[in-house]
Amino acid sequence: MADGLASSPSSPSSPSPPPPLHPFTLSPLQHLKRITPIILITLIGLVAYYPTLTLNFFWEDPFDIGQVDSLSYFQLLTAPNSNSYYRPLALIILKALKLGANYSAFPYHLFNVAFHLLAAVLLYGLANHLFKNRAVAFSAGVLFVLYPIGYEAPARASSMHSLYICLTLIALWSYSIARQKDSRRHYALTFLCAALFPPLHENGIMLPPLIVVLEIYLLWQYKLKRSFIALIYFVPALIFLVIWFSIPKSGEAPAIGVRGFEALYLSQGISFPIARLMSQLNGFGLTAITQALMAAASAALFLFLTRTRYSLPPLVLALIWWGVAMSLAWIARPIEYLEVSPRVMYFPSWAASLAWGMILLDKEKWRRAVGGVTVVFVVLQSWTTLQQSTQLYLNGSRWMDQVITIGKGGGRLLFVNAPDRFMYREQLYPLGYWGMLVAPVSQDLSDFVRFTTGVTMETKSLSDFQLMQPMMDASPYFVNTRGSANAHASDVMYDSILWADKVMWTDYARDGSLTIKYVGDVRPTLLTSTLIGRIGDVADVAGASVMRDGNLLRVTLLWRSLSAAKPTDTIFVHVLDSSSTLVGQGDGESLNGLLPPSAWRSGHEIEDARVIIFDSPLIAGEYRITVGMYDRADGKRYKAFDAKGVEVSEGELEVGRVTVK
């Protein structure tokens, strides 16, 4: 066979494929044996990625997707994407996935997850085709579908990464068939993939070098006739580069260069099992750089020392593929970009998965046994790490769900201690930021509301680090907040509260959940003329509402500021049973601590929402809710008076009652 498989049986590095079986000659059992790995890879991927389908929009999705609204499909062909990029096909797909008047995240996540699973199946097919070993192919497919280090890519709604990995794998598989069978149809399919990839993402210019690497491997291992046909696949990439460089760019030009630290960071994409193990073992007290170096060296030693002459060439192929696929990110992006963009690890992830799956490609039983144990370890580790990342993204997305639900009511909202990004305290890998970018300051929170509901409203974001610190001490996260300047007890905080219709506070729980709650409002004019009572000469209690919700009471107080309180003055809210025994309390400054009474401005109306949580259910009976103020310096309470001006006992003004049946 001039252009067929002409490998020498005497060469230990040359694959020896069995004769092909026609599908119609296979028995049902043989059919089942063929499709079982594909079914298993798909099922594993569905279980792992099902939660991803429930994610909302985050990061810069409103801009990246929303920019297509004002343009026709034809105009998208000439529109630069995200400042310095040209991705017309990506924009066309993003526009097509908008299925209603407003945007829903589900079609975008379904698109990405579906192509991620398809890519895993295609990797299985490519590996099985090249190496004729179902165990290697299955391991590579499972490792890819669970690849944990680049989860950001398939999890982000506006991402096209899963699709263009599919194009890459189809192109390589098709080219291999074309060279072995001299099939024009497969050459054409490869060219189609090479033409479609660059308009999706600039990583498409790396597909021709990947094909050239495969051509060299086929010449080396399959003894095919020399051919220069691989060079034709550079044509679409060159045309794309001409167009890309001719587009006016408002963003910063890529900082082209070869950098050692960036290479070390990116090496975690191939050394990920060992790099993860280093972090799980707390790095043995070593610096992050030393950990990454040790992980890279250990991974290289393990992969090469466990290879024989028979299995070394496929490993070399996978590693070179990984390096080529990673090279554009390495030479074009500085570490400041890379370390907060783990999605760059995703494009080469199929080659990394192939390299680790390759440890099963051996003739010696003991080597295959070692390889099998290693693959099982990496799969289990990848599964647990992926679940951690998925849970992190779910928590961030649930927070965004709350933003949108609250925001669709319109008006002006002030968000306090809202996350910009957050990550686990336990670093998943030695170098980099392995968290979630929820809502960077480049996007206003109102953008997400308008994008998904069509409601136009306004938001501001501020941080109060002093009030946030106790939550952070108990939280599993490190958090960067929106409005990074500390506005604690400042005029900026007060004026922003005046500007807002509602003030929304983010709670960070021990279990990692993020909850937004309404904490109050301040109005410069009085909207209420009622009176419950007065606390000293500092404030009137104009109104109150009490609502029981399971094991908690929601108490909302309406204060009218009369004169300045002392800096040490604070508020108490008590829950008393029928015998006047204290059974619960919600003491502290107004608006969840944001505004101490000393900050109140005379004549302003302060709505103060509090939540009192009980450790156990309240027993049946009637409960009184009382309020007052005291000086923290000496514990002395202010006198309190009812609406008729009569002084009440113990400085406790009753503002409501609740009955538990």
Language-model-detected regions and their locations in the chain:
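C-terminal luminal/periplasmic domains and tails of membrane-associated envelope-modifying transferases
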Residues: 3-8, 23-26, 404-412, 418-423, ...
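Ser/Thr/Pro-rich low-complexity tandem-repeat tracts
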Residues: 8-19
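Arg/Gly-rich low-complexity intrinsically disordered repeat tracts
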Residues: 17-29
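Polytopic membrane enzymes that build or remodel cell-surface glycoconjugates and lipids
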Residues: 2-10, 27-462, 472, 482-486, ...
